[in-house]
Amino acid sequence: MKKITICLMIFFTTLTVFSQNNEIGVFVGGANYIGDVGPTTYIHPFSYNISTNAVAGIIFRKNLNERIALRAKFNYAKIGSSDNWPKTAEYRKQRGKYFKNSINELNLGVDFNFLDFDIYSSSLQMTPYISSGISLFRYDLLRYESGVAKANKYGDATDLSFPITIGYKIKPLNSFIIAFEINANYSNSDNLDGSYPGQKQMASSDYFGSTLSKDWYVFSGITFTYLFGNKKCYCAN
């Protein structure tokens, strides 16, 4: 993953040097997970415990025109859930499992603005948008030892996830953009929660839940970005 990150940094640095219409900034918010442990609320920032369900990251965006932009984003998140939390199904409460995990995610995607969003205009700009792409993420491998309620780490792994983002952004000042977005990620893992560890661990572990669907993680938050690069030049013929 380190080599991929370096290559992407070189690519976007080159893109920035020879072009314009760039944004760079930060993303902060809450995270929640959807899987085989705890409640199944789809969007629930901070999920009862801010210390284990938060996300922060950096974002780079290249605006191709008023409707389309490319994005690269790196996030670090903590996720967790418990069968003892409110709104959990009764059969899960009787089981009493809980876990914590961490995610390092690199995302590449394309944004589509529903309205024209002119980054050069001095007037207020705003638009809803959607985004999708692909993410590479690293997470802790977890398992539940037989008869133990808390998941324990036994390694780490790298996998893919497929994000769908909806958001709303505003440009209140010439060089700053604020966006509110919800980013739902369908992961290629069924073990973010420790419910389905590797074959070697299953003999000495409690495993449970459905293998028909993978785990999801959701980031909900705010981005603050700064516009940089040369403005359009309207030259006389």
Please give the residue ranges for each predicted region:
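Residues that define the transmembrane beta-barrel architecture of outer-membrane proteins
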Residues: 20, 50-54, 102-106, 126, ...
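Gram-negative (and chloroplast) outer-membrane scaffold detector with strong preference
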Residues: 62, 66-144, 228
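Predominantly the C-terminal beta-signal and adjacent terminal strand-loop region
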Residues: 171-237
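Residues on the lipid-exposed face of transmembrane beta-strands in outer-membrane beta-barrel proteins
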Residues: 26, 30, 58-62, 108-112, ...
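Short glycine/proline- and aromatic-enriched beta-strand/turn motifs that initiate or cap beta-hairpins
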Residues: 19-61, 219-232
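Bacterial Sec-dependent N-terminal signal peptides
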Residues: 1-27, 228, 235-237
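Repeated loop/turn-to-beta-strand initiation elements of outer-membrane beta-barrel proteins
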Residues: 22, 67-70, 118, 174-178, ...
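Extracellular loop and loop/strand-boundary signature of outer-membrane beta-barrel proteins
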Residues: 41-46, 92-99, 148-154, 207-210
